[in-house]
Design a protein with these regions (language model features):
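Glycine-rich segments within core transmembrane alpha-helices of 12-TM secondary carriers
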Residues: 1-4, 80-106
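Central cavity-lining transmembrane alpha-helices of secondary-active solute carriers
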Residues: 1-13
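C-terminal ends and interior cores of transmembrane alpha-helices
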Residues: 9, 21-44
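A membrane-interface helix-boundary motif in multi-pass transporters
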Residues: 17-21, 105-128
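Intracellular juxtamembrane helix-capping segments at the cytosolic ends
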Residues: 60-75
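C-terminal membrane-cytosol helix-exit motif in multi-pass small-molecule transporters
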Residues: 127-147
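Juxtamembrane intracellular "pre-TM" segments in multi-pass secondary transporters
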Residues: 143-175
Length: 179
């Protein structure tokens, strides 16, 4: 999430935001499934660490693409409604991530008698949820934008201009250092 200001120009210039959203959901789903597969291993920690890092990176990428897509696709009124819905689900995700997941794993542990199996089943279930979400978004997300040029010199120029405009904003150096 820290590198979003540097990563977002690439998302904006390479491929469509719709394809980034769907692709990142598929990648997160794959990572969750791989976490489920590696939990029973003795050296699960290093594998899950890599997959969680990929999930964090993919999540930030999807967030950038989703922000861009709703700005392109929705009217100002609909954008306000979308932000309200998005914030509601963000809060629900925090509650779910902090409590419901642990309750489910506890229930699965009681059911199976094996904590590793319970966590694996949970991550497989989350993976299926992301695959269903990706399929749903493939069907319903609007195709409102054109694919951008993959000309490397043009991409570099756009990236440079975006970064330059970011760092030329008033008080950006103070904000960056104090953060």
């Amino acid at each position: 999430w820290v590198i979003k200001p540097f990563w977002s120009p690439i998302i904006d210039t390479v491929n469509t935001k719709r394809s980034w959203i769907i692709g990142m959901q598929l990648l997160i789903g794959c990572c969750l499934a791989l976490i489920g597969l590696t939990i029973p291993l003795e050296s699960f920690f290093k594998y899950t660490l890599v997959f969680f890092w990929l999930i964090a990176f993919s999540s930030a990428t999807q967030d950038i693409a989703a922000d861009g897509l709703y700005l392109l696709s929705l009217s100002s009124h609909d954008q306000a409604w979308y932000i309200g819905i998005r914030n509601t689900f963000y809060r629900l995700a925090i509650i779910t991530g902090q409590g419901l997941i642990i309750i489910i794993v506890g229930y699965l542990t009681d059911l199976t008698g094996q904590i590793y199996l319970a966590w694996s089943l949970l991550f497989f279930s989350l993976s299926v949820t992301l695959f269903i979400s990706a399929f749903y978004h493939y069907k319903v997300l609007p195709k409102t934008e054109q694919k951008r040029s993959n000309n490397s010199s043009q991409l570099f120029q756009e990236f440079y201009l975006i970064l330059k405009s970011f760092f030329l904003k008033p008080s950006i150096s103070i904000s960056t250092v104090s953060y």
